[in-house]
Regions:
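Active-site-proximal loop/helix segment associated with metal-binding centers of metalloenzymes
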Residues: 13-47, 163-210
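Divalent metal-coordination and catalytic microenvironments
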Residues: 8, 76, 81, 100, ...
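N-terminal active-site segment of His-dependent metallophosphoesterases
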Residues: 1-94
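Extended active-site neighborhood of metal-dependent phosphoesterases/phosphodiesterases
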Residues: 91-197, 232, 237, 265-292, ...
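Active-site environment of divalent metal-dependent phosphoester hydrolases
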Residues: 10-15, 83-87, 117-129, 171-175, ...
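Beta-strand-turn-beta hairpins that frame and shape the catalytic cleft
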Residues: 1-4, 13-17, 154-168, 207-211, ...
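Binuclear metal-dependent phosphoesterase catalytic core
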Residues: 249-326
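His/acidic metal-ligating clusters that form di-metal
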Residues: 66-74, 109, 157, 162-164, ...
Length: 326
């Protein structure tokens, strides 16, 4: 068994690239001394310490695909966040959809019938600090499922190992509902209930002598999954949980320490989502988590790459992060 995982690609298509350029121009101007300083700081932080230069993300993505081809995997899993989420509303934004569709189409061409695609938080929609608007949208979920073929839940079996993919944004739905459209909330709740039932049924049906490799974009979902009795009972059978979202593996160690700080609930959407998600970080380790880095890491190639998973003849499961350089 050979698996290759790529996550948090964040490639910008032509439409998002133009929006990003306009946004960066706006962030570098500002009015008033304090506002100008704050906006320039945000501009530099986005450029240098998180998403790096958008012009180079595609090069990192293409190089990552080359490295995956050389590995000859049985399955390739894309662990969410394909585009830049320029509008803060996920795939319902035309430019974001264009970016994500380009990524997914190319991967299917290179790895036909060997790809699984996951939802990331930015694919469904998430409030944007930069443009100060956005949130989850049902249209984004529907576009991803119906047009791009991203499944909220999927399962494959390779001998005695079950590969299970889940939609972390449905599990952590309460974190995002304050920014949802009011008329969509009942349908969101229905979809969450349906998704949780799929996940718990899969674990209930798991034979006691077989193992799971779980794929989950946002680690915040793990603290809610462990609350389900059937998952608590089966946690020893979870060989690995492959995470995305964090862009680089060292942040997993950092967030382990953050919950020890005094609890608080910020009113600002992004701060609130992070605070609520981190409260259960001490439970994540039940899932044997490992972070798949973004191909470009967190800027300037810091810990960027892809993740390889291999089963040895003596039934051990080995993981290896492979650095991507351009």
């Amino acid at each position: 068994m050979r698996l290759a995982i790529i996550s948090d690609i964040h490639v910008l298509g032509p439409g998002e690239h133009e929006k990003d350029r306009e946004l960066m121009d706006a962030l570098s101007i500002g009015r008033g001394r304090m506002r100008s300083v704050g906006r320039r700081f945000l501009h530099r932080a986005r450029r240098r310490f998180w998403n790096w230069h958008p012009e180079s993300r595609r090069a990192c993505f293409l190089k990552a695909l080359e490295e995956i081809q050389l590995y000859h995997p049985d399955w390739v899993v894309a662990n969410g966040d394909y585009a830049g989420d320029a509008g803060g509303v996920g795939l319902s934004d035309e430019s974001t959809y264009e970016s994500a569709a380009g990524v997914i189409t190319l991967m299917r061409e290179i790895f036909p019938d060997r790809c699984h695609f996951m939802f990331g938080d930015h694919d469904i929609g998430k409030y944007s600090t930069a443009i100060r608007q956005g949130g989850i949208r049902l249209a984004s979920l529907q576009r991803g499922e119906d047009i791009l073929g991203i499944r909220s839940f999927w399962q494959e079996q390779i001998e005695d190992i079950h590969l299970i993919g889940i939609n972390s944004s449905l599990i952590t739905l309460d974190f995002f509902l304050p920014e949802a459209l009011t008329e969509e909330i009942p349908e969101w709740n229905r979809r969450r209930q349906q998704h949780e039932q799929q996940v718990t049924e899969a674990f209930s049906a798991l034979p006691s002598d077989e193992r799971v490799i779980l794929f989950c974009h946002d680690p915040s979902a793990l603290g809610l999954l462990i609350q389900h009795p059937v998952i608590r009972e089966r946690k020893e059978q979870i060989a690995l949980t492959v995470l995305g979202h964090l862009h680089q593996p060292h942040l997993l160690t950092l967030v382990q320490r953050l919950p020890r700080m005094p609890g608080w609930t910020p009113k600002y959407p992004v701060g609130r989502i992070m605070s609520e998600g981190l409260r259960s970080a001490k439970t994540w380790w039940h899932f044997n988590p490992i972070v798949c880095p973004s191909p470009f890491g967190t800027g300037q190639h810091v810990s960027g790459g892809v993740l390889f998973i291999e089963r040895t003849p003596d039934n051990r499961i080995l993981t290896r992060r492979h650095r991507v350089t351009i």
